[in-house]
Structures are given as structure tokens and as C-alpha cells.
């Protein structure tokens, strides 16, 4: 690592043979109902999991540190939506979703005993991420009744997403955006 003047700050390689064995089952269930030919209503709930990755526990920047107690994220996700095709011209998928993470991995600024301020990567807190997504696709070939040997469509995709930490043992995190 070099400073802004090009001087060598640190040239150190640390080897690790750390192993994190895991064994688990993730469960989920989904349902759908089609009250009309052009409309399907669906919902899903499932457990989610994100393991600590190599990039979570390896750093090259001396301004970053890794919390030695970093653990995997666990939680669940829910979604509810409607989708379908209207007159073979317009297809759509509109959904609401929520993801809940226990012990979400992230960075926090920390003051260390030597007075240095560093970004520490570790488990920040419990987080919820929620939003709305939509996709509307217009089949231009069907709309203009053109030969089916060709394909062309126009689509609009939107997402509205918000998130926040619901609980954390770290001061100043609860209620903040993820």
C-alpha cells in the first residue's frame, strides 16, 4: 500500500487456513392462484442466508479492520405479487417484498485505543429491506399485428426500495438506513 506521495506504507502478507464449515437446510413455501386467464396472484416466504465470504474477511487497506467475531447473516424474505398477460400484448409483474436479515454484515466507523479511526467490517445489526417492483412489457409485434417471425418489445421496469436497521448493539445504528 502506498500513500499519496507514492511511499510504501505497508508490505505484508498474512496467510490463513481458516475454515468455516456449515451444514443447514433452508426452507421456503410459495403459493399462487389464477382467478382469471390474464391474472395470477402469488406469494412466497423463505429463509435466507449469506455466508461470510473471503472478501468479508480479507483487506488490503490499512484504514479497514475485520471484526474477529464476524458471523453469517440469516433471516427470511416475503413477497406478494400479481402477474399475467393481457390480450397477448401486455405482460406484467407487480410485487411487494420484504427481506429481514439478522446480523447483517457491513462497515461501521470505530475509534481504536491508539486514537485511529478505522472502518470495521462485521455484523452491524438486524435490518429490514422492503419495496415494490414492477415490470410491464409491451409486445410491439402483437400490438401492430406484424409477422410473428420477428420480435420486438418495449418494457418499463421500476423499483422503490427502502431499508433500515431495526436493532443493533452498536450505538447510533438502530433506525439508520442500510
Residue locations for each model-derived region?
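Signature of Gram-negative outer-membrane beta-barrel scaffolds
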Residues: 1-36
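Outer-membrane beta-barrel translocator domains and adjoining extracellular loop/strand segments
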Residues: 2-10, 54-61, 104-112, 146-148, ...
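Extracellular loop and loop/strand-boundary signature of outer-membrane beta-barrel proteins
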Residues: 8-18, 62-68, 77, 117-124, ...
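Transmembrane beta-barrel strand/turn architecture of Gram-negative outer membrane proteins
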Residues: 22-35, 74, 78, 153-161
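Exposed loop/turn and edge beta-strand positions of beta-sandwich/beta-sheet ligand-binding modules
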Residues: 23-25, 64, 76, 118, ...
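Generic recognition of flexible, low-complexity loop/linker segments
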Residues: 29, 67, 142-144
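Membrane-embedded beta-barrel scaffold of Gram-negative outer-membrane proteins
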Residues: 32-34, 38-46, 50-52, 56, ...
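Gram-negative outer-membrane beta-barrel transporters
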Residues: 91, 96-100, 118-178
Amino acid at each position: 500500500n502506498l500513500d499519496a506521495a507514492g511511499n510504501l506504507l505497508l508490505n505484508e502478507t498474512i496467510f490463513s487456513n481458516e475454515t468455516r464449515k456449515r451444514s443447514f437446510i433452508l426452507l421456503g413455501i410459495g403459493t399462487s392462484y389464477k382467478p382469471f386467464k390474464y391474472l395470477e396472484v402469488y406469494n412466497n416466504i423463505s429463509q435466507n442466508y449469506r455466508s461470510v465470504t473471503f472478501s468479508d474477511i480479507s483487506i488490503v487497506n490499512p484504514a479497514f479492520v475485520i471484526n474477529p467475531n464476524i458471523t453469517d447473516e440469516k433471516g427470511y424474505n416475503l413477497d406478494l405479487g400479481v402477474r399475467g398477460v393481457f390480450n397477448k400484448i401486455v405482460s406484467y409483474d407487480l410485487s411487494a417484498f420484504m427481506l429481514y436479515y439478522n446480523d447483517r454484515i457491513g462497515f461501521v466507523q470505530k475509534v481504536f485505543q491508539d486514537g485511529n479511526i478505522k472502518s470495521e467490517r462485521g455484523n452491524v445489526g438486524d435490518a429490514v429491506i422492503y419495496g415494490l417492483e414492477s415490470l410491464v412489457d409491451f409486445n410491439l409485434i402483437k400490438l401492430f399485428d406484424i409477422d410473428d417471425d420477428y420480435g420486438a418489445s418495449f418494457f418499463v421496469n421500476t423499483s422503490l426500495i427502502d431499508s433500515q436497521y431495526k436493532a443493533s448493539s452498536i450505538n447510533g445504528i438502530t433506525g439508520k438506513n442500510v
